[in-house]
Amino acid sequence: MANQGQRVSWGDESTKIRGRSNSRGRKINNIPLSFFNPITLQQGAKFWNSCPRDFVPKGIGNRDQQIGYWNRQTRYRMVKGQRKELPERWFFYYLGTGPHADAKFKDKLDGVVWVAKDGAMNKPTTLGSRGANNESKALKFDGKVPGEFQLEVNQSRDNSRSRSQSRSRSRNRSQSRGRQQSNNKKDDSVEQAVLAALKKLGVYTEKQQQRSRSKSKERSNSKTRDTTPKNENKHTWKRTAGKGDVTRFYGARSSSANFGDSDLVANGSSAKHYPQLAECVPSVSSILFGSYWTSKEDGDQIEVTFTHKYHLPKDHPKTEQFLQQINAYACPSEVAKEQRKRKSRSKSAERSEQEVVPDSLIENYTDVFDDTQVEMIDEVTN
């Protein structure tokens, strides 16, 4: 019966007895690979205090073979000559396999925690260990995973060796490149010193002249990026104002399109106060969800109208700028007003220099228009 083993029963087992001893155990250079990814233990936690006694991964073996142990892997890193401890990692092995293949179930070994499913056979399994060319499996359990355990993904000894070798090769290549770059820098510094000395003497090398010509050619060939919005194939209500006259896309100012003075209409988004004015306009979501919408048929199209009401701070400078743009097309521009003032002062000076004309010959021409005083006002064009 001893060779056939007995079935595991945790019924009378104390939860604190977990098969751990104070002995250091034996070191094995070539540790067999686990079938599963490891668990990284939270810093400061004790694996044997948190690990459930039936904490056997799912996916390999039959009901009788759900028995084994978790084996600790201590890790550290050298930082400035000092050894810095890293969180422990624990790997699972089935009974009769792994670094403690000869150990019996519940033998007290340092860095070993025994686990088994109720009803598993207490005898070595024949499952073996993972081959070096096979990928480790993800950990899956029937019960809840303790919060101190982090289940790693695709972490195995062969992968670790590969990464270590890769880092070593990368480090060697980096050092080689570093030495090569250092030598190149020395050569470049000598070359630069010679070129600087020649430049002081007024001597320019062919290489310097080629560089100068190349840079000039690059500057001449460089093209200014076109930032003009692509409005040609868009509906009017989907177009975006660019730099320049906006009447091409939105039409002349009228009672139905009454925003913008002559400067804003002529320059579009490049107008001086355009960014400030745009900040006073409602967002798309505000218009969409905060407006009153109506629609009606208009030939083969649908005419959509919305009414949106919102409030701007009365004393804010941006509000004043914004209000000045409403119906501005119907008001004289500041430029025209200034032209009228200058023209009026000029005519007054001319009249004072002329001879006095008898009162009977004076006629009232105050309402006569001068072509320099005429202000062009956009009208609705259909």
Swiss-Prot record:
Residues 231-334 are annotated as: Dimerization. Residues 1-24, 150-190, 202-240, 334-362 are annotated as: Disordered. Residues 31-153 form the CoV N NTD domain. It is found in: Virion; Host endoplasmic reticulum-Golgi intermediate compartment; Host Golgi apparatus. Residues 33-159 are annotated as: RNA-binding. ADP-ribosylated. The ADP-ribosylation is retained in the virion during infection. GO terms for molecular function: RNA binding. Homooligomer. Both monomeric and oligomeric forms interact with RNA. Interacts with protein M. Interacts with NSP3; this interaction serves to tether the genome to the newly translated replicase-transcriptase complex at a very early stage of infection. Belongs to the alphacoronavirus nucleocapsid protein family. This is Nucleoprotein.
